[in-house]
A protein has these predicted regions:
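N-terminal alpha-helical transmembrane segments of multi-pass membrane transport
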Residues: 4, 18, 22, 28-53, ...
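N-terminal glycine-rich phosphate/adenylate-binding segment common to multiple enzyme folds
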Residues: 49-155
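Active-site pocket-lining segments that scaffold enzyme catalytic pockets across diverse folds
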Residues: 182-231
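Generic secondary-structure signature for well-ordered alpha-helical cores
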Residues: 28-32, 36, 66-69, 101-108, ...
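Short glycine-rich or small-residue beta-strand-to-loop segments that form or flank ligand, phosphate
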Residues: 7-16, 72-74, 177-182, 205-214
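Conserved small/polar residues in nucleotide/adenosyl-binding loops
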Residues: 232-236
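Flexible, glycine/proline-enriched loop segments at strand-loop-helix junctions
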Residues: 85-86, 131, 141-142, 153-154, ...
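Gly-rich Lys/Arg/Thr-decorated short loops/hinges at beta-loop-alpha junctions or inter-strand turns
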Residues: 5, 146-180
Length: 236
């Protein structure tokens, strides 16, 4: 039987532990007998990320951007236990977060629909796809373990070095923790356009959810930019 040819390469991102083993078996048994596999290979296993100071992850992100498609196995985002287990020089960042930030992409989680797999909710006849913004927020958050009494503040200094805002986050009376997140208007607009374009391409309604009644600046910005994008792209 003649194998299917791949005229254009894709980025192949190998992973950690059992996903590395399973991906090898999938290729050996289900792909290579039928396809002339044409890939650019990147080993995103934790030992190789340590050896390359995580440069391999950045190279993989560039390859996906250049080739327009990549297949990635699951990877370990190390915690303190993994750092000790693997002898890591530092707690390397999540490869997924690094790749998403480099691509300024959107994560779509869509179900695989086949007749042999019955849905848990049998009355649902159409798929539900979850879209998640892939930039900023928790993945780019700055955190601090508060050792004791003190005041946490949110300060913004403009490009001229002028302090334009100072707000008290919390007056700590004892140990605690504080976290700061951010996002950018251009990235949120890109996310909105991506969601609307995806919905149109697959014929699915787009539902937006936020907590703008509580988060009157952060979530409200998402809501307003989504509204603006929808109004701008809607047919007259």
């Amino acid at each position: 039987m003649e194998k299917i040819k791949m005229p254009h390469p894709i980025a192949e991102l190998d992973g950690d532990e059992m996903t590395h083993v399973l991906w090898g078996k999938i290729k050996e048994q289900l792909i290579l007998p039928f396809v002339e596999l044409n890939t650019e290979y990147y080993d995103l296993g934790l030992p190789n990320r340590e050896r390359t100071a995580d440069q391999v992850t950045r190279d993989a992100a560039e390859a996906i951007h250049r080739l327009h498609i990549g297949v990635k196995c699951a990877t370990i985002t190390p915690n303190l236990q993994r750092q000790e287990e693997y002898g890591l020089s530092q707690l390397w960042k999540s490869p997924n977060a690094t790749i998403r930030a480099a691509l300024d992409g959107t994560v779509f989680r869509a179900p695989i629909l086949i007749s042999r797999v019955k849905p848990v909710v049998t009355s649902w006849k159409k798929p539900v796809t979850i879209a998640r913004h892939a930039y900023g927020d928790l993945y780019k958050a700055v955190e601090y373990r508060v050792p004791g009494k003190g005041k946490a503040e949110l300060v913004f200094t403009d490009e001229n070095g002028v302090e334009t805002s100072r707000q008290t986050v919390y007056q700590f009376s004892g140990p605690g923790v504080v976290q700061a997140m951010h996002n950018r208007d251009d990235s949120i607009l890109s996310f909105a356009r991506c969601c609307l374009s995806y919905g149109l391409s697959v014929g699915q309604d787009v539902w937006f959810s936020s907590k703008d009644t509580i988060s009157k600046d952060y979530d409200q910005t998402f809501k307003l930019l989504f509204q603006n994008c929808l109004l701008y792209t809607s047919p007259s």
